[in-house]
Amino acid sequence: MAKTVLICDDALFMRTMLAGILTGAGFEILGEAQTGTEAVKQYRELQPDLVTMDIVMPDMGGIDAVRAIIKEYPHARILMCSAMGQQALVIEAIQAGARDFVVKPFQPSRVLEAVQRVLG
């Protein structure tokens, strides 16, 4: 059975790119969210094996969404994907409960390596 994924990013292009990388590697995309609030709501409904989460999104940012998900589901597996590769944000995302971090633009191989570490 394929591992399931929820993709959270406000940019359609990034959601489409991640979906292509992940479905090509045998993952099933259960849903997509454009805001942090949608991400939390969809996580509750879908409970995927993995979440990819952008940091900067309208409404509720990715780090706050990670905190909200981890508060309810401490074992959630979340991979941050953001253009903002600043050290402080990486540390904050990991402290919030994210398991790994990839910086955009990324190579498909780097995304898949991070996914394997997060699911490992």
Predicted regions located by residue number:
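Conserved sequence signature across two-component system core domains
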Residues: 8-9, 33, 51
